[in-house]
Swiss-Prot record:
A divalent metal cation binds at residues 10, 12, 44. This is 2-C-methyl-D-erythritol 2,4-cyclodiphosphate synthase. The keyword GTP-binding does not apply. The record marks 36, 135 as: Transition state stabilizer. Binds 1 divalent metal cation per subunit.
Length: 161
């Protein structure tokens, strides 16, 4: 069995007058995130982790913010495309672990819905998906409520022929 680990990281600042979408879930908050796509910083980090595990670069390479085709793009569609690239190479998801770093809004009430989105889009069991949140104790840009950062790690496996 061949196993690969991928790590993804993404950051977006608050400031857009739009819904705040995190992991495909609309989270009530006073503002959305500034981005070329829908700004789903969680799915961007997971997509980057999958691409990293496959040595395929990052989401900026596959979905450049200079391409108007991705203006306002649904990040769930982008995530599924990244996972399709992995499946085309014979890989499947082992598990995903996500850490959302934000002083606000409160993430905990939305974690189960976020896990379900990832399980659905990655065709995984719910117990293979972990989403957690933390703060930076009011330090740095996330602590000042200027934006959200996310780290994601995926384990991908392929049976050897």
């Amino acid at each position: 069995m061949k196993i690969r680990i991928g790590h993804g990281f993404d950051v977006h600042k608050f400031g857009e007058v739009r819904p705040l979408i995190l992991c495909g879930v609309e989270v009530p908050y006073e503002t959305g995130l500034v981005a070329h796509s829908d700004g789903d910083v969680v799915l961007h980090a997971v997509s980057d982790a999958i691409l990293g595990a496959m040595a395929l670069g990052d989401i900026g390479k596959h979905f450049p913010d200079t391409d108007t085709a991705y203006k306002g793009a649904d990040s769930r569609v982008l995530l599924r495309h990244c996972y399709d690239l992995a499946k085309q190479r014979g890989f499947e998801l082992g598990n995903v672990d996500v850490t959302i770093i934000a002083q606000a809004p409160k993430i905990a009430p939305h974690i189960e819905a976020m896990r379900q989105v990832l399980a659905t889009d990655l065709m995984a069991e719910l117990d293979d998906i972990n989403v957690k949140a933390t703060t930076t104790e009011k330090l740095g840009f996330t602590g000042r409520k200027e934006g959200i950062a996310v780290e994601a790690v995926v384990l991908m496996s392929r049976k050897q022929d």
